[in-house]
Curated annotation (Swiss-Prot):
Protein role: Plays a role in intracellular enveloped virus (IEV) transport to the cell surface through microtubule transport. Together with protein OPG064, forms a complex that interacts with host KLC2 (kinesin light chain isoform 2) to engage the kinesin-1 complex and thereby promote IEV trafficking.
Subcellular localization(s) per the UniProt record: Virion membrane; Host endosome
Keywords: Early protein, Host endosome, Host-virus interaction, Late protein, Membrane, Microtubular outwards viral transport, Viral release from host cell, Virion, Virulence
Top-level taxon of origin: Viruses
Coiled-coil residues: none
Residue stretches spanning the membrane: none
Main location: virion
Protein name (record): Protein OPG056
A GO biological process held by the record: microtubule-dependent intracellular transport of viral material towards cell periphery
Organism expressing this protein natively: Vaccinia virus (strain Ankara) (VACV)
Amino acid sequence: MLNRIQTLMKTANNYETIEILRNYLRLYIILARNEEGHGILIYDDNIDSVMSMMNITILEVIGLTTHCTKLRSSPPIPMSRLFMDEIDHESYYSPKTSDYPLIDIIRKRSHEQGDIALALERYGIENTDSISEINEWLSSKGLACYRFVKFNDYRKQMYRKFSRCTIVDSMIIGHIGHHYIWIKNLETYTRPEIDVLPFDIKYISRDELWARISSSLDQTHIKTIAVSVYGAITDNGPIPYMISTYPGNTFVNFNSVKNLILNFLDWIKDIMTSTRTIILVGYMSNLFDIPLLTVYWPNNCGWKIYNNTLISSDGARVIWMDAYKFSCGLSLQDYCYHWGSKPESRPFDLIKKSDAKRNSKSLVKESMASLKSLYEAFETQSGALEVLMSPCRMFSFSRIEDMFLTSVINRVSENTGMGMYYPTNDIPSLFIESSICLDYIIVNNQESNKYRIKSVLDIISSKQYPAGRPNYVKNGTKGKLYIALCKVTVPTNDHIPVVYHDDDNTTTFITVLTSVDIETAIRAGYSIVELGALQWDNNIPELKNGLLDSIKMIYDLNAVTTNNLLEQLIENINFNNSSIISLFYTFAISYCRAFIYSIMETIDPVYISQFSYKELYVSSSYKDINESMSQMVKL
């Protein structure tokens, strides 16, 4: 099996081979090393991230294991409570999602009945979901004629003498609970179909849930420590045996991983006496150090580990930064060299435990020298980038692309006096992220050539992006930027699917789309009904001039690292959906997807295999490379 995986890894440069590799990753975790000996754990959920960071065909596959757990995710964002909007029809009134729909109904009825309105104003009413308690209140106020009666009871002739009673249709709706509809006209009423929606757009648009990006960038410097975790191979999979820090201590324990981690955490706690947050800086730590520690994280140790964050029971935080994500693909030694520190080799990971134990003294010495070099390089880089990309600071970001683009967006938007805003609450964040689709859409399986947009930056820099806080609208306004909750119906004829949905058997579904994606979908023959939207009245002017100014500064630095950054930005931006500028990303991705679709319109659909927002797979038999295709590069 190991030989098979090693062969697949060396040839994992095409879609078919990568898919075969994924199948094995459902059963095994690959233990690999790069050319500098840094360990890398590859599993089903992180292979795309690994491939975006490095060429996996040159990695050395050391072994396979089933003993190593996956990287533990952050606590999931609470699911947005399902939502039903208010419907005020001539035959009935259905309140919006509420813990107390009966109270909403009596308040609605008070708009027509002055005596109810007067009683509410004079005495008020306690929240309740009990019909008997509502009726008791009505009776005590001399309003028994308006008593609430369930529709089924009324039809049994039990309450026909109460001509002014409030007839309610009672129901239980999945994931919502009890709901009531006030029946205004018995003769014309039929129970309506009510859309149960994943988001309450009116709530999401509230001003207090949005903040200016610039307000989040003014952060003071936090204590920084370089760190590296080293792992050895045993019969039961890899284990951490050494944790090195600089400036700081090195912890070594071959007998108890639990004690190794506890000693490290005790030291962390001791150095946090004067601060509530510190930064640990590693290199490729997201691919080895953190997931390896996560496997053995002790229960009841006073700390929880979630992705790159450690949180103590008293609220202290340790943020574990991966400097590799700010290196533009440089090796550790090249990164240190280009930021002015002496490059030192580091101990190899995934060596035998017996070898590590025998050479522990030299490994400690080698580790400390390597970490000192990393620490000095990081401090120099962070100082340079914080000048270049002011007011952004490295520790506020997980990737250099986010830092660069945030600085440009902030500079351009602040110069216009408008500013870009971001959601400060989980629910609006989830709404924005739901509109970001990075998945491939499969059209048909055939041998294909892969094409990629030549310059994502060229496409996105000439477009407009939202400025200011959003407003709620029922339907978006043509010509304005908005993100809408949509009911989507796919075309009945043969079509290229341009709106991603994970159920091929469903012809109508609800999803979140930008105004740009809505235009693209309508062009492709989809029917779109908007169910509420966040709309922006102002736009940030095109970013091209701001990008050019920043790019000129990068050129002026004339360093390999910054030139690599420039190349990476121009040729291959990899967006993500968990960034302070996710609002920018969602529209940038939509603009790229619209560009891809404009190229697909010039190609016979039978030749299209699959596509994403920046890549297109076209049948190998397709020969008519037109002018539109010249804007893409064949890989």
